[in-house]
C-alpha cells in the first residue's frame, strides 16, 4: 500500500455533500492523515461556488493541508491515493425528469428506484467507467476509488462488467442511516451495532441486530409496530434523513413489517412493495428533486454567497452518517483495519441461492486489498425471488447501456416491480429517451431507427 499523509481527490467536488464529507475528514485527521485534498468537477461554476466553503472547513482544522480545485483530471488524480466519487450525471435538472416522467404515467417517481433509477443508471455507467480510466492513468497504482455515485447497484454492476479489475469499493449510506436510527431507538451509538444483512443496494433486509452479542431485532419489532424506524421524537433522527419525506419513509417500515415481520427491510423497499400508496402521496408537480433544489442546495449556495461577502459561514450543511461512513471505510482500506461494514461486493457464493457473479450488498471485512464478504448462505424463497427479479432488471439495463439496445432497456423497465405493464414500461422509456437525448445517443439512435416497433 502507501503511507500517510494521503492525497485525496473528490470527484464531483461541486456536490452539496462535499462540505459535510470534508468536515468528517477534518475531525478524523488523526485516523486518516491528509497532505492534500483536491476537488474535481466538470461543472467549474458549481464547484467554484462550493470550494470556498470547503476551504473554510479545512482551514478551521488545518493550515498545512494543501487544497486544490480543478477541472483537469491530470491535476486532480496525479499521485492520488484515494478518490471519493460522488458524480450526479445530469444534476438535479435530470433527477427532476427521472421522478416526474414516471409519475405522469401513475408509476413511482424516485431517484434510484423504479424507472427513475434505471434512467439515472443509463446516464451514469459510462461516465463512471471514464472516471475509473482517468484514475487508472494518473493516480497511484494502488489507489482506491470509494464510490458513492448512485444508482449504486447499477453502477457497481456496470463496473463489474466493464472494468472487473478496478480498485473500486461501492458503498451506500442508507443501511448506515437505518443503523443510526436503530441505535437511537436502542440508546446506543450505531457503531456498537453488529448487523447481519443481505440483498442488493436499496433492496435488502436486516436479519439480526446485535448489541454486545444480544439480538435486538425483537425489541426493534415492537418499537416499529408503534413508530416505524424512528425514535418517538422524529427530530432525533439523522439530520440528512429527517425532513418530512424521510419521516414518511421511516414510518413506512411499519406496514411492511406488519405483513412480513421476520426481517427489517431497507427503507427503499417501500417503492417496490407498496408502490400504489407511494404514488398516491407523491406530488407529480413537486418531487423530492424540487425539495432538494429548494432546500439543501439553495441553503448551501446562499451560505456560500454570504461567506464570500462577509467571511461568516452559516451552519448550512450536515455532518451525518454520509460523511462519517465514507471516512470509516477509507480508514479501514488505508490501514488494513478489517472493520466490518455493509458494502457492495461480487457475490461469489456469499448468498448461496443468488448468481455467483451478482453484485450484492452484505457485511464484509474491509482490508487494504478490498472487502472480504461474510457468508450469508441460503435466503428464503420469497426474498430470493424478489432479488432475482430486481437483479435481472439491473443486469439487462447494464447490457442495454453496453450494447445501445432499446429492446434490453425495455425489458429492464418491464421487469421492474414498480412498473405494472409492458405498455407502461414502453411509454415511460420512450419519454425518458427523449428527455435524455443529450446523454443516451446510442439508445436514442436505436429508438429512432425502430430497433423494435414503435406505436
Report residues per predicted region:
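Conserved glycine-rich cofactor-binding loop
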Residues: 14
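Long, compositionally biased stretches enriched for glycine and/or charged residues
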Residues: 187-455
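Internal, well-ordered domain-core segments that constitute the primary functional module
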Residues: 131-214
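Short acidic low-complexity segments
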Residues: 66-79
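Rossmann-fold NAD(P)-binding glycine/threonine-rich loop
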Residues: 89, 93-162
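Glycine-rich phosphate-binding loop and adjoining beta1-alpha1-beta2 segment
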Residues: 27-62
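Redox-cofactor binding/interface segments in oxidoreductases and associated redox assembly factors
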Residues: 78, 84-85, 147
